């Protein structure tokens, strides 16, 4: 069924680099940072606003690319950006996160094709989770920064989900343990990071109520 969704088939990303295009400008020599926003991403103003792009580009001299994850923004399948990624059919979540890993690897390949020699990744919330996934497959990343990463969506669902919906799910035999088992196949916690420890970074909020500290400690 997931393959029948048309919008996620086309990749989208926002790009901000010196002089817009052309390696001749010296843009290719600048390090690139892949910035991955969180749940309900997909609007350039909001996505760029989460990462202080002018500071990253002008102060640090970085080129930026902000990919739009499946089921978000121009790739959404319902009225609201992100619907289906973390709610609804569990298999849609699994397929969307698997596609996320695939898409991000294609983003890395595209950036390399622009002549980039140093590529880092920085994600927030769902983007932090996606950063951890990418770090399990790309050994040549200059850095991977997982910010406020959700690491266990099953636990988060049971923490924030509507009680009536959770009760119905459990009556159908879909409890926390079953959901955790299903989502293990797309969990960065069961994958070995491919980049060295000294190039991996993580941070969270001690009082964050959406992504609580135990998610970051995991």
Model feature map: region roles:
Residues 37, 123-125, 205:
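Conserved alpha/beta-hydrolase "nucleophile elbow" surrounding the catalytic nucleophile
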Residues 3-79:
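Short, surface-exposed "cap/lid" segments of acyl-processing enzymes
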